[in-house]
Structures are given as structure tokens and as C-alpha cells.
Amino acid sequence: KYSPAVRHRIQSGFNVSAIDYVRAQRARQWFSHQMAESMKKVDVLITPSVPIQTPTITDCTPAPGKSTAGGELAIFTGVFDTTGQPSHLIPCGFTIGGMPIGMMINGHPFDESTVLRVGHAFEKLTNWHQRPPTDIPATI
């Protein structure tokens, strides 16, 4: 069973016309090309996994007629989901309140090996991946 918010997102896809779908695919191809061009001088691009402190489930549950923090969560992941570039999300710390912080290692199309090697190197130098969050409210 889907939550009302997820059900709404799925149902909104039923209203996309074939013309709008083709336009969106063309825009996606253009954007993918722009991202590939912008990353030519780097091996990977490291970003936060989310642009805000990790919200609780309560923070992401919309009240009737209200938006939630959940919509902001996909700002970084959505870019690379759209372009099809490989990404690896790994823990890199905690907020003062104990909420987990993650970073996203993003690579060139079809270069998963570099993304995973960078992630592995980070994990060898740190121990964040071995430290589970403690005493925090339920998170998504």
C-alpha cells in the first residue's frame, strides 16, 4: 500500500502526454550532455547527499495542503538520476543532534569503477561507515 504522497506522485505520471514525454526526453538528453561537458576536467563530483539536515519521518509527512522537507531531498540525487551518471552515497558524519550526514560521489557515465574506488578509499581513511546513528528519532 502506498502513502497518499507516493500515490499522488505515481498518479501524476498518468497525465503526461506523448508529446510532453518526448520533450522531456529531449531535455534530459540535452541536460545529460551539459553535465558530461561540465565534468570533463574532474574524475568525480562530490556533493552532499541531501541539501538539508536529514529530516525525521514526521518532517516528511505532509499535512493537508502543505509541502514537506521531503521534496528538497532529491535536489542532488535527482540530477544524477536524470543524467544516468553513477553515484555512490556513503556516510560521512553526524549533525550535532546526531542525525546522519551523507556524501554522494558522482562520476562519468558508465564509470562506476572510479566512483566505487573513490568511495572505498574514503572508507579506508575514515570509519563513518562503521558508526551507526544512535538515539535519534525515526528517519527516512
Predicted regions and their residues:
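Short, gly/Ser/Thr-rich active-site loops of penicillin-recognizing serine hydrolases
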Residues: V115-I140
